[in-house]
A protein has these predicted regions:
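Feature recognizes metal-dependent phosphohydrolase scaffolds
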Residues: 1-326
C-alpha cells in the first residue's frame, strides 16, 4: 500500500518529531478521539491535561469545541477544550520553529503568531487584518512567539517519550515501513496517494530537498529515503532532517501526499471570515483528464504510458459536494 498524509504524520510522531506528535494529538483532541491515544497506544495525556487546566483556567476555550465522534464520551468537555487549545498553540509554535529551520520549504505565509496584534486582537494574513475570535495566549511571548514555554517544553518531552515508548504504536509503524511506500507500480498501473507536483503548464515541478532539487519519480524516492532515515537512523542531524521531511510531507504544497497551497488550520480556529480558509489545490488536479500529462507521469515512473491498460490509481481525492464538485 501507499502512505497517505495521515500515515506520514503518525510515522513522524512515532519517530519522535515534536511537530508531528502535536499534529496527531491536536487532531485526536479535535474529534474527541482520545481512546486511540490512551487506550489503544498507551499515550499518557495526563501531563498535557494538567498543563491545560492550569494554563487556561477561567478560559472557556469556545473556539476549541470537540467536533465529536461515536466514541467520544464528553465526561468533562471543559477540560477537553482546554487540552485541545493547549496542544494547538504548542503545534503552531513547533511548526513556526520548523519553518524557520527550513527556508527552502517556502512556508513563511504560515508564520502567523508573530502577525498577532495582542492589543487590537487582530492577525494579519496575506497583508489583510482580521479580528481574532480568541486572543488569550498566556504562553506566547510577544518578543519570541514561537518559543515553547517551560511548561509546554515539559509536556512535549513527556509526550515524545510516550510515543517513542509505545510498543504497539512502534509495531504498527514498522508494518507501515515493511509493507508501505510512496508509490507502487503494479500490473502496469501506478499507485500513489496524493499527486505528482506539477507546474501550472503541466511540466514536472522541481522541488528542493536538502541541497538539491528533484522531480517526478526521483522526488518520490528521495523523500521516501529521508522518511526511512528519520525513523531508523540513530539520533543526529540526518535523523532530524528525516523527521522534518515527514512534516513537510504532511503540510507542504510541494508534498506528493498533500498537494494544497497551504493548510489553514490557524484561520479555521481563530478567524470567522471563511474567505481565508481556502486551500488552493496543486496544478496536478487540473490535468487529471489530460492524456499527454498522464502519459508523461506513467512513463516517468517506468510504465508504458501508451498502454490502454495502464492507469494511475490515486487516493486523496476530496470532493466538496456543497461547492458543486463531482
Amino acid at each position: 500500500f501507499q502512505w497517505g498524509n495521515h500515515d506520514i504524520c503518525w510515522i513522524g510522531a512515532a519517530s519522535g518529531s515534536l511537530a508531528c506528535i502535536a499534529s496527531v494529538v491536536r487532531i485526536s483532541a479535535k474529534y474527541g478521539n482520545f481512546n486511540t491515544l490512551e487506550s489503544g497506544y498507551g499515550i499518557n495525556l495526563l501531563p498535557l491535561a494538567k498543563f491545560a487546566l492550569d494554563t487556561y483556567a477561567g478560559d472557556p476555550c469556545e473556539c476549541f469545541k470537540i467536533t465529536g465522534s461515536q466514541s467520544y464520551d464528553p465526561y468533562d468537555p471543559d477540560m477537553d477544550r482546554k487540552l485541545h487549545k493547549a496542544i494547538t498553540v504548542i503545534l503552531f509554535k513547533l511548526e513556526g520553529q520548523l519553518i524557520a529551520r527550513h527556508p527552502e520549504y517556502h512556508m513563511e505565509q504560515r508564520l502567523l503568531l508573530d502577525k498577532i496584534d495582542f492589543e487590537e486582537k487582530t492577525v494579519t494574513i496575506d497583508g489583510k487584518r482580521y479580528p481574532l475570535d480568541d486572543c488569550n495566549f498566556p504562553t506566547i511571548d510577544k518578543n519570541d512567539p514561537y518559543k515553547l514555554s517551560e511548561g509546554e517544553e515539559v509536556v512535549m518531552q513527556k509526550l515524545r517519550a510516550s510515543f517513542l515508548g509505545s510498543e504497539k504504536l512502534q509495531r504498527h509503524i514498522s508494518f507501515l515501513f515493511a509493507r508501505g511506500s510512496m508509490y507502487l507500480p503494479c500490473n502496469g498501473n501506478l499507485l500513489y496517494h496524493g499527486c505528482v507536483p506539477l507546474e501550472e503548464n503541466g511540466a514536472f515541478k522541481e522541488v528542493q530537498v536538502g541541497d538539491a532539487t528533484y522531480h517526478g519519480r526521483a522526488l518520490f524516492e528521495k523523500l521516501e529515503e529521508w522518511v526511512r532515515k528519520g525513523y531508523y537512523l540513530p539520533e543526529g542531524e540526518e535523523r532530524r532532517f528525516g523527521q522534518d521531511t515527514m512534516w513537510f510531507l504532511w503540510a507542504n504544497e510541494n508534498s506528493p501526499l498533500y498537494g494544497k497551497e497551504r493548510m489553514t488550520t490557524f484561520e479555521r480556529y481563530f478567524v470567522k471570515d471563511p474567505s481565508c480558509y481556502y486551500e488552493a489545490k496543486s496544478a496536478y488536479y487540473k490535468y487529471l483528464d489530460n492524456d499527454k500529462v498522464i502519459t508523461a507521469i506513467l512513463n516517468e515512473f517506468g510504465l508504458d504510458g501508451k498502454s490502454p491498460s495502464a492507469h494511475i490509481i490515486n487516493g486523496h481525492m476530496p470532493v466538496h459536494l456543497k461547492s458543486g464538485e463531482t
